[in-house]
Amino acid sequence: MAPINGSRNGKHSKPQRGGNLKRKRVQEDLNSLIKKVEDLDVKETIEQFTDLPLSEPTASGLASSHYKTLTDIQSRAISHALKGRDILGAAKTGSGKTLAFLIPILENLYRKQWSEHDGLGALVLSPTRELAIQIFEVLRKVGRYHTFSAGLVIGGKSLREEQERLGRMNILVCTPGRMLQHLDQTSFFETHNLQMLVLDEADRILDMGFQKTVDAIIGHLPKERQTLLFSATQTKKVSDLARLSLQDPEYVAVHEAASSATPSKLQQHYVVTPLPQKLDVLWSFIRSNLKSKTIVFLSSGKQVRFVYESFRHMQPGVPLMHLHGRQKQGGRLDITTKFSSAQHAVLFATDVAARGLDFPAVDWVIQLDCPEDADTYIHRVGRTARYERDGRAVLFLDPSEEKGMLKRLEQKKVQVERINVKANKQQSIKDQLQNMCFKDPELKYLGQKAFISYAKSVYVQKDKEIFNIKELKLDEFAGSLGLPGAPRIKFIKGDDTKERKNAPRATAYLSSDDESDEEGEKKKTKKDETQVRTKYDRMFERRNQDVLADHYHKLINDDGTMVETNKATEDADEDDDFLSVKRRYEAGDKDLDVGGSSSEDEEDADGTEKKGAKVVHLDGKEALVIDSKRREKLLKSKKKLLKFKGKGTKLIYDDEGNAHELYEMEDEEQFKAKGDAKEQQAKFLAEEAERTRQADLEDKEVAKQKKREKKEKRKARERELLAMEEEGGDLVQIPYKEGGLASDEDEEVLRPSKKARVSFADEASEEEPKPKKAKKSQPAGKAPEQIETLEDLESLAAGLLG
């Protein structure tokens, strides 16, 4: 008979047999795959993905995503990674480095039969959020047939939602900052079982910007792991490799022997243009290339915002977008998506978009500001000419930057050709920018911040052969932005300290006199009413009254004119600090001691007190002199009057009522006059012992007296009870108080302890509460009885006893 659940046992059990066969077949395929990987020759050049020893889910994902042919970096790196070796991979931009580490991640975890119960198996670190999103999208396409759980952990999203899902992830793609936050704050997130660590754009992650963060992350990870590093400009520093605990890494540099570090189909040019003409040349370029897809790189986010807002108002005829690190994550993602799908557009961006991002069909890469080094240049131009496509790049250089930058590019095998701008095609937009800044104070403020951020980006660079802020025409550059004058730049010290020190004193004295004269003229009324004032003069003199008024006021001179670059104004700028001393106090100043009276109010020049001053003595060493209204206010402040009051003394009083100090000490001479110290000690001990004995006797006598009184009260109560029994009267309970029988006065005090009941009966009924009290004293549950004889009393006592 078959079981209740309908299943069969014995030789006809087909489902169980089929399950065993399937598990056996999967295990055989896994063993075969492991053997193929072990037999793989890393020196062999593999061109097709079908020739690699890959699992069925990975092969199906590659075929569905239309990946068929391997690139050079993929052919050389995947073989070493499948065997579990650490890799340092360096290849040109757009050469397919992402698949070179994603395929080994999927395969190594698949061969180990990784599941959600095993925890985190692979961690991929990316320097930017956009690159992390791009890596995650490729992982989703290639690993769609695997059963692994993958997650994206970047800033700008809800931390709590990420914490809830983090414990179930097998593969994580993240940015360093958010990953460290989870390692420190998410309690159930464990990384002790990590198998692979991947650093994309490793040179950027390992530099000074992420050094502390990456060191902290590595401190949470196990040392026994496989580490893969990929970048277009790879690091070989021993210190960096030691931090990552690399074990005999394999250096895979595909294009190390190539003649150029950039893609072969990339056309690279540079234009020497003065700093004040950069925006004019950029505008002319955009107007002449409306049917192109262009990325324009600038050095700071404030420059990106200003150029985007100003060009957007002028409407060049092509869609404009901007991308920088201060934008919210949702906005950044929308912009990257729109620019990727756009056919013709211009994207103004910082170096956030310089690494790893794959924007399809980018025609031009314009570097409006000089990159900080040759590696940054390589990554910027790598946004075009990807995957063997054509691309063009143009670098804008100031004459002071040309020689040093070309030297750095030659050291990195980067060859750039110089081109000239046709003067007849160049358009000037200086007047348009001035008009917009005049009408829009917010755009004017944005231009001032853009100017300061550019100057700061040049000032902080270490390579002074390229970046020398003293050789830049900053005043003319401010005018090209539409600003009425160059904003203050407090971090630029102007001339050297040695030059200022050797300058003649007369020059500094005259400049200080001129400044004081100018300040005096400000206080006077305007006398030059007949002078003609144009609308531009009024524009420069007006003050903003909107939300940006305070910020705008900090960026210009107090008179609204442009900042002059002479020594006097530079010294004045140095004195105009964020914190200024309102009043300086010296040691011994009476204002500081007493609370703020001026020296003129206190004393005359000869040190005598003023006439009519009042002197108040408050039992202190110093008398209070009241010679001004400010001093008179001291009388209302108890805290400030404490200085003029003497210190209080604590007194005790003896039995006779005489006051004594708390501690009355004898002089040394008086003490010696009384005799030897040991004799005085023995005498004192004897006196104290006698005093203690007498006090003990008195206490014992008091205790005996209390005990005697208590005994007498108890006997008096017993005698009273016996007398009542002999008389045969009613038994009345006498109130008992601790220590003896209660007196008549005690009874009177005890009786009104309960509130008298309010009764509406007649007066006769109000006189009957006394016998009721006697009845209440009887035991509960028994009716009161009249005791007439001794037998009745004995029977009542027997009943009470039991």
Swiss-Prot record:
SMART domains according to UniProt: DEXDc, DUF4217, HELICc
Region (Disordered): 1-24, 494-538, 589-614, 685-802
Keywords: ATP-binding, Helicase, Hydrolase, Nucleotide-binding, Nucleus, Ribosome biogenesis, RNA-binding, rRNA processing
Composition bias, Basic and acidic residues: 520-538, 685-704
Keyword Signal appears in the UniProt entry: no
Domain Helicase ATP-binding: 78-252
CDD domains, A to Z: DEADc_DDX10 (cd17941), SF2_C_DEAD (cd18787)
Domains: entry comment: The Q motif is unique to and characteristic of the DEAD box family of RNA helicases and controls ATP binding and hydrolysis.
Oligomer status and interactors: Interacts with the U3 and U14 snoRNAs. Associates with pre-ribosomal complexes.
Record's function text: ATP-dependent RNA helicase required for ribosome biogenesis. Involved in the release of U14 snoRNA in pre-ribosomal complexes. Required for pre-rRNA cleavage at site A2.
Protein name: ATP-dependent RNA helicase dbp4
